[in-house]
Every structure is written in structure tokens, then in C-alpha cells.
Amino acid sequence: MISFLLLIFLIQLAIYIVNTIGSSTIDDLLWILYLRLPMPISKDTRKHGELKHDVVQLKREMNATSSQDEFAKWAKLRRRHDKAMEEYEAMNRSMGSRKTSFQFSIKIARWLTLNGPRLFIQFYYTKTPVFDLPAGWFPYPVEWILSFPRAPLGSVSIQVWSSACATAISLAGDVVIAVVQRRQASNRQAQAVPAGKSEAATK
């Protein structure tokens, strides 16, 4: 069975990844993947795209047709455009409502998957020590803080371990992001220097 140490660390890591990427970005990606599944909504998505194409095409034809010289043709295009636009707006509202419901379900599932287990473990195993501290290594105030709120004195509580994991993951993530950004900046500078030298040589 997976240990509390690793389980809590993995939960905090998953929460950090989701928060770093952004819940809205993940929701949009899952919505796109959902639309590609072989389900009735995929047919509605294709029809939605076709209606949008028809509306744009009819609008172009209307603009290319003179309402004075070719009124009959222009009026026919206008009726077709208005009808297609009405169908498109109705389907657009329907798709928007479906997307809102889908994203709401995803938010609930994400909370139950990440925060739900974390809160359950912290509440249900609040008296269970994650690991014991070496005897006599830390003074009483430090042992009391590390065992807060209800773990045995001389041990590390789940709450403290969870906070430590979250802090360590956040700091490590910041370091990785800073290193990547610095390397990207160095690469851009390295690519810009030869271009500047070549321009100077040309002059």
C-alpha cells in the first residue's frame, strides 16, 4: 500500500500542476477532447461549424451583390443569411449552455479528485503520525508544532507534512520556471548576436 508520505506528496504535486497550468486551460482542453468523442454532441459541433461557414459565405455574397441593381438576388441572399444566422445563434446558445454544464461537472470532479482526498485524509487521519522524530533532537515547542494539531508528540502530523510538501513543490517549481526562462532568454540573445554582427559587416 502506498505510504502517507508519498500519497500526500503526489496529491500536492497534482494540485500544483493544475494550479500552474490553469483550471480554465485544462477545462478548455477537456472540452475540445470531449467534442471529438463519437457522441451526438460531435455531430452538433460539425453542424455548428457548417452553419458558421454558411453565415460567413452568405454575408460575403450579400456584400458582393448590389441591393439596387440586383435587388431580387440580394433579397434572396438576405433571407437565407437571416435564417442561417438565426439557426447559428440558437445552436451557439445551446453549445454554450452545454459547455458551461460540462465545465461545472469538470470543476466538481477536479475538486473531488484533488482536494476531496486531501481534506479527507487530513481529517480522518489527524491523529496518525506520518513519521516519528528522533528522540531528543528537537525541543518541546518544535515537537509540539510539528505534531500539530492532534498527532502524538514527537511525530510529524499529516497537516504539517502536507504543508511542507506544498511549500517544497512550490519552491522547486519556481526554481525550474526561473531556470527555463533564463535559458530561453540566453538562447534568444545568442540568436540575436550573429544577426547584429552580420548587419554590421554588411554596412
Curated annotation (Swiss-Prot):
Interacts with get3. It is a multi-pass membrane protein. Required for the post-translational delivery of tail-anchored (TA) proteins to the endoplasmic reticulum. Acts as a membrane receptor for soluble get3, which recognizes and selectively binds the transmembrane domain of TA proteins in the cytosol. It holds the Pfam family CHD5. Belongs to the WRB/GET1 family. GO terms for biological process: tail-anchored membrane protein insertion into ER membrane. It comes from Talaromyces marneffei (strain ATCC 18224 / CBS 334.59 / QM 7333). One of its GO terms (molecular function) is protein-membrane adaptor activity. Residues 25-110, 173-203 are cytoplasmic. It comes from the Eukaryota. Its main location: endoplasmic reticulum. InterPro entries: Get1, Get1_fungi, Helix_hairpin_bin_sf. GO terms for cellular component: endoplasmic reticulum membrane; GET complex. Keywords: Coiled coil, Endoplasmic reticulum, Membrane, Transmembrane, Transmembrane helix, Transport. Residues 1-4, 132-155 are lumenal. Residues 72-97 form a coiled coil. The chain crosses the membrane at residues 5-24, 111-131, 156-172. It is found in: Endoplasmic reticulum membrane. This is Protein get1.
